[in-house]
Amino acid sequence: MQFKYIPNILSFPRIFLAPLFMVFMFKDIFIYRILSIIIFFIGSILDFLDGYIARKYNFMSDFGRYLDPIADKVLIISAFLTLNLFYPMLVKSWMILVIITRDIIVTLFRFLLMNNNVVMKTSKYAKAKTLVQIILIHIILVMHLYNLALFPVLEQSIYYIMLFCTIYTLLTGIHYIKINLNHLK
């Protein structure tokens, strides 16, 4: 095995963990709730590891540049869609629509740039966005484990964090387009 493919090998499981995460979430039994947290946590760690290894050892590839953002979006959007079904007053449908629309536009823009031999690097703002999304999802999953209704103060906070996350996600999309638009000329 060539070590340069390790980041890609770490990206693939995230795509397959997403439906598994969703299945366990819908099995509304305590052990399955724990498994859904573990699955999402593993996906989050794999996201960190593939990027870290790719950058540290310069194991970046064109295929990985396509695969990694798609794997990220599949895992995170699957989590938000599932959480929307459980907590529609916290993770609102319009918020998910904004996040999905932004992700589709940025991903298509990234692919367009790649077809023009331009690599759109992940900005520190987008990395922060992903971190906030992952932390928020983990918090909701832990609260789901113990029944969210037991945390009324946190429940209100979660809504505002989700709102912030949605707005910040939109702003990072605008930022990406703005700083990379000149590469299309």
Please give the residue ranges for each predicted region.
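Alpha-helical transmembrane bundles and membrane-interface segments of multipass inner-membrane proteins
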Residues: 1-185
